[in-house]
């Protein structure tokens, strides 16, 4: 067995298992780590190590999630698995575990079930870009026609939610038999890993995306001008480049005349760094926290969007009572709260703590946003929900 060493040279990809309860997500997770460790080196994780998922807090929400890692010859994977359905809902909406692709586990003995559909819908809403299907428990189905029927149903379901159902890879396997070391079923796990490598494209790194910095603070420095500070979310800003100030007010243009970090002057600020950016020709009062600095044309301000939202339960410190249409909380984007109104789906009269729900939100000020942006719902500074922009409307 080769010594473990963390290779930074390999692309890093985030994946996870989704699907109906008891269809074998956790068993598959254990089988992947075990078979790939045996095939390519690395460490296996036992089923019970994965099933005892530790509690985590993401935006004040309690989520049980297991994280495992494994390697193929060309990539390093970080993989999340959740014990309960509610954990998946919270995980996907908060983006606590951002997935570059998901493995949808469907038991061949059952076919698609209610949570199968719900997880596909959630995947669509929160922007999981690719889904691969693992048809599990195939050792228990002798009838080839039945397997073909289940495959067809899964493809139709994926297509319903705008995933390419006809082109989605479907691997027929048995996670349990693979875990028990039966060669023909171990081969199916290696086949699945091959599809992870080939079907999920390498994710674009934050530093390669267009520049964006959420503004946290604004200062004026006499004789030099106005400085905004914040952590660069993505991309690079170079001294001398044009930037746009987006959100809350009319979009304005400026030029970056300096970048500093820890009181040192730099030529550029990069994704992940906390920097101050000096702006030419902008007055202190023309710019505020909650706006973003961005590469011109890369992001637009919007006020109305479709969202997928999780409302905290009472135990999580959320509301104790339901809310109704006409509810006007604050929506916290990046660095600031903006009041907004909501429209509930047809036939939904009220939303209870612990529910997840689709809602259309209209903000009183525009905010720089793209599909996939996460936000919190707050009442007087207290978080009562978490959400994601599923689709910008206007």
UniProtKB/Swiss-Prot annotation:
Stretches the record annotates as G2: 60-64
Record flagged with keyword NAD: no
Annotated EC: 3.6.5.3
Gene3D superfamilies linked: P-loop containing nucleotide triphosphate hydrolases, Translation factors
Source taxon at top rank: Bacteria
Pfam families assigned: GTP_EFTU, GTP_EFTU_D2, GTP_EFTU_D3
GO cellular component, one term: cytosol
Reaction catalysis annotation: GTP + H2O = GDP + phosphate + H(+)
Keywords per UniProt: Cytoplasm, Elongation factor, GTP-binding, Hydrolase, Magnesium, Metal-binding, Nucleotide-binding, Protein biosynthesis
Residues the entry annotates as binding GTP: 19-26, 81-85, 136-139
Chain residue ranges for the region called G1: 19-26
Localization terms from the record: Cytoplasm
Function, as annotated: GTP hydrolase that promotes the GTP-dependent binding of aminoacyl-tRNA to the A-site of ribosomes during protein biosynthesis.
PANTHER family listed in its UniProt record: ELONGATION FACTOR TU, MITOCHONDRIAL, ELONGATION FACTOR TU-RELATED
Name used for this protein in its record: Elongation factor Tu
Name of the gene this protein is made from: tuf1
């Amino acid at each position: 067995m080769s010594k473990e060493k963390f290779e930074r040279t390999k692309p890093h990809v985030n994946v996870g298992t989704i699907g109906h309860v008891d269809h074998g997500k956790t068993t598959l997770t254990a089988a992947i780590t075990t078979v790939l460790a045996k095939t390519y080196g690395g460490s296996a994780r036992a089923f019970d190590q994965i099933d005892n998922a530790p509690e985590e807090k993401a935006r004040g929400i309690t989520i049980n999630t297991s994280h495992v890692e494994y390697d193929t010859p060309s990539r390093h994977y970080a993989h999340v698995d959740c014990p309960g359905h509610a954990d998946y809902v919270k995980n996907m909406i908060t983006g606590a575990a951002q997935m570059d692709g998901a493995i949808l586990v469907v038991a061949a003995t059952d076919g698609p079930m209610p949570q199968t559909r719900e997880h596909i819908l959630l995947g669509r809403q929160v922007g999981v870009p690719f889904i691969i299907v693992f048809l599990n428990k195939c050792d228990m189905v002798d009838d080839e026609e039945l397997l073909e029927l289940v495959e067809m149903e899964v493809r139709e379901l994926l297509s319903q939610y705008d995933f390419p159902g006809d082109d989605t890879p479907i691997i027929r396997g048995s996670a349990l038999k693979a875990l028990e070391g039966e060669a023909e079923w171990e081969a199916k796990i290696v086949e699945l890993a091959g599809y992870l490598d080939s079907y999920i494209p390498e994710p674009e790194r934050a530093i390669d995306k267009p520049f964006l910095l959420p503004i946290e603070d604004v200062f004026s420095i006499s004789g030099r001008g106005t400085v905004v500070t914040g952590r660069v979310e993505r991309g690079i800003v170079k001294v001398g480049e044009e930037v746009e100030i987006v959100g809350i007010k009319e979009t304005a243009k400026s030029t970056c005349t300096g970048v500093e970090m820890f009181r040192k002057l730099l030529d550029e600020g990069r994704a992940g760094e906390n920097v101050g950016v000096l702006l030419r020709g902008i007055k202190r009062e023309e710019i505020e926290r909650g706006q973003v600095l961005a590469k011109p044309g890369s992001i637009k301000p919007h006020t109305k969007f479709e969202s997928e939202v999780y409302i905290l339960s009472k135990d999580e410190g959320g509301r104790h009572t339901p809310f109704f249409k006409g509810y006007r909380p604050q929506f916290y984007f990046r660095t600031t709260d903006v009041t907004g109104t909501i429209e509930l789906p047809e036939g939904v009269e009220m939303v209870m703590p612990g529910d997840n729900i689709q809602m259309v939100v209209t903000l009183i000020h525009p905010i720089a946003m793209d599909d996939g942006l996460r936000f919190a719902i707050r009442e007087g500074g207290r978080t009562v929900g978490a959400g994601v922009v599923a689709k910008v409307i206007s």
